[in-house]
């Protein structure tokens, strides 16, 4: 078993500083945050230690990332991006899905082979309606993962942010019953 962490906790660090920290503390791997470049909407979102789009376009950048981590004896075990892929705002949904697909492609290009993410949830819809939405949203994401030979790991955190948020959270798959249906 390897011990690692999600790099989003080191939100003020560069990719090199994050990998150096992991190495110095004796971690064997990291789940590297890959949010789109720009301002965060919530805590830990917006952290981008690896720029997925750049990793797809710039071969030297992709090689540098993998070689730097390898030289520090730190494996990049997964690329991490946890958006709400079922956001009721269709423009937001389209934007996050396209970035998630690019994170999947980058994971393949970097030889990582794993992306960690959420299913998401339309907080204004019922569980049953969200289960139908999964059937609309996720096939194209899974298709990209299959094409790139990248596995997807789904986190089941309910994403409950506080009393001002709807009690169902922002992630559909938080119970065994819902997991079985998905």
List the model feature ranges, each with a label.
Residues 12-13, 124:
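Loop/helix-junction capping segments adjacent to catalytic residues or to phosphate/diphosphate-binding pockets
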Residues 2, 13, 17, 23, ...:
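Acidic/histidine-rich catalytic cores of soluble enzymes
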Residues 6-10:
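N-terminal beta1-alpha1 ligand-phosphate binding loop
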Residues 18-19, 65:
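Short secondary-structure capping/turn segments at boundaries of alpha-helices and beta-strands
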Residues 27-139, 146-151:
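Structural motif corresponding to the early beta-alpha repeats
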Residues 1-4, 69:
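N-terminal amphipathic alpha-helix/helix-capping segment at the start of soluble metabolic enzymes
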